[in-house]
């Protein structure tokens, strides 16, 4: 019985740590948005907790849009 309780507490602890790590800023969980314009601008966005390059159209989109990978990582990890 005690082993089950300990295992449950460990699982809850890991889930709690994961939620804190990924909830740094709500904008980091937004899907990258290309926007409405037709430009082809390399940008970075947080996807699944990692900063990845995407092509931004130049207007519209959302706040998950960074000029450099370093800027993305500073904000979203």
From Swiss-Prot:
GO MF terms, alphabetically ordered: serine-type endopeptidase inhibitor activity
InterPro entries: Kunitz_BPTI, Kunitz_BPTI_sf, Prtase_inh_Kunz-CS, TFPI/VKTCI-like
Position of the signal peptide: 1-23
Disulfide partners: 28-76, 37-59, 51-72
Coiled coil residues, start to end: none
Keyword Secreted part of the UniProt annotation: yes
Tissue: Expressed by the venom gland.
Keywords: Disulfide bond, Protease inhibitor, Secreted, Serine protease inhibitor, Signal
Compartment list: Secreted
A cellular-component GO term for this protein: extracellular space
Main location: secreted
Keyword Disulfide bond part of the UniProt annotation: yes
Site entry: Reactive bond for trypsin: 35-36
Domain BPTI/Kunitz inhibitor: 28-76
A Pfam entry, by short name: Kunitz_BPTI
Similarity-based family: Belongs to the venom Kunitz-type family.
Reported function: Serine protease inhibitor.
UniProt protein name: Kunitz-type serine protease inhibitor cvp2
